Amino acid sequence: MDLGSLISETRNPDTLDLDNLSTLDMVTKLNQQDTTVAGAVSRTLPQVAEAVDSAAATLLAGGRLIYIGAGTSGRLGVLDASECPPTFGIPHGVVIGLIAGGPAALVTSVEGAEDDEGLGISDLQAQNLSANDMVIGLAASGRTPYAIGALRYARQLGCRTAAISCNPHSPLALEAEIAISPLVGPEALTGSTRLKSGTAQKLVLNMISTGAMIKIGKVYQNLMVDMRASNVKLVDRARRMVCEATGCEVAQAESALQQAQYEVKTAILMILTDLTAEQAGQRLAMHGGFLRAALQGHSQQPQAHK
């Protein structure tokens, strides 16, 4: 492939004078470029929605969601995966981020790692990849061998697959069932895909992980009710979520949370149904962990739930 022909590698005619601008004019021009990213992502929403549904189906069936990429793309996948356990209360290892070169590549460049298709395959094999899992390949260019090899292997195993790249009809996209390609255009700094391309990938990853977690019952209304209250800030947030969802006072929220071992969903259900912590936990289990379903039809639901 002629790398110079990739949109992400071409020069941006609007930023040819970056080195000759005042600092304010320079950052203004960079910001103007960034404002185009959300629009580019919006044009991929049908494909993003498809990826959300696929990821949710994978997780509900007991499979894992695995991001794999190199450089900035790989780091973004690791970042998104690492945020899922504290935000949504899922175990570590349910959403996984893999980067070419391993953990060391998060802070330093590992030369040549992205050019090895076999390395992408072996990294997935090390995770005992199975057909129950979903693999999302990440590469701004869409031609990174590490990610392409990984997606090809995942598809051969029968995994659900998706690709996120910022060039149209890329080799990576052709390996995936779902191709998400936000076309952000040439970078402000030629070839520096950590800029608009990285921002676009982050926005898409945000939607995929958040959307999938909503669809598997980790969110009630717009509250992350499976959050782990692991520090002072999050304990306070847990109290506020219980108060906001039920209309109760802080003291009642704190009492319910203590009885529920700081499981927010359980505490909310206890207050709205007068169930004990054990009964509320059982009722949630009967409804697959979906709080709205557990509350459905109960006479004590507040107006917001009707």
Curated annotation (Swiss-Prot):
The record lists the catalysed reaction(s) as: N-acetyl-D-muramate 6-phosphate + H2O = N-acetyl-D-glucosamine 6-phosphate + (R)-lactate
Q: What is its EC number?
A: 4.2.1.126
Induction cue? Induced by MurNAc 6-phosphate that releases the repressor MurR from the DNA. Repressed by MurR in the absence of MurNAc 6-phosphate.
Q: Which domain of life is it from?
A: Bacteria
Q: Which GO terms describe its biological process?
A: 1,6-anhydro-N-acetyl-beta-muramic acid catabolic process; amino sugar catabolic process; N-acetylmuramic acid catabolic process; peptidoglycan turnover
SUPFAM superfamilies assigned: SIS domain
- Give every SIS domain span: 55-218
Any one Pfam family here would be GKRP_SIS_N
Which CDD domains did the record assign? Answer: SIS_Etherase
User: Belongs to which family?
Assistant: Belongs to the GCKR-like family. MurNAc-6-P etherase subfamily.
UniProt subunit comment: Homodimer.
This protein is called: N-acetylmuramic acid 6-phosphate etherase
Q: Which organism is it from?
A: Erwinia tasmaniensis (strain DSM 17950 / CFBP 7177 / CIP 109463 / NCPPB 4357 / Et1/99)
Gene from which the chain derives: murQ
